[in-house]
């Protein structure tokens, strides 16, 4: 993080449970005082937790690549890798993939796939139970249709493609191939692990989460443009947190492009609740989520 700041990379003040650690604050891993804001250390680390605690770090989008290059140069190309992800075959995709191999006409494949209810995580077994029309197609006189549904049910849940984790990076003290199998990955010079995140951690390797956050890029560009156009140099880290004009904008719902405050629903609640201090915004951001809203 020190190197990132030295390179001019925008670094987020703290994300997730790590903000509850006073040690992280003192080391400037985070910039949020957990004692001042009453944050819980136990969310970060407690006796019931077996795995290493997570420290998620936000960088501006371009800066994330610069930080990755720094890490590779510091620790070595053979000690740094992305984490592989596995994409499995869901119900609709299983039907479409099998239909393509079976050479089932596209219109029939579309019709079968559209009979599966639009619900995340639904399985073909559930779809057959809920949609009699789809279940009936398993006994279709058209052999291709019946076989497509039969084979789709067998292949459902199989790994269909691989990718790399959006932010997870493994850094080892020795060459990673001493501990886990590696592979090349598309669109990156780094290796990727052939174990996914949960297995990588069970082997004992440390996972770091480097996130590229568009909002930090926008703030960074805004600061640069203000300096160019107005000659005013703004230090984001020393901005006052009690500026009345800023809270007036929040109270009026004028928050377009403000991270997590730009939705129509949030703007409505801002106009209703009229926040006038930082703690009000913290509470609103925490509560405006599906669970608390219910």
Write out the residue ranges for each language-model feature.
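Alpha-helical scaffold/interaction cores of sigma-54-like transcription cofactors
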Residues: 1-294
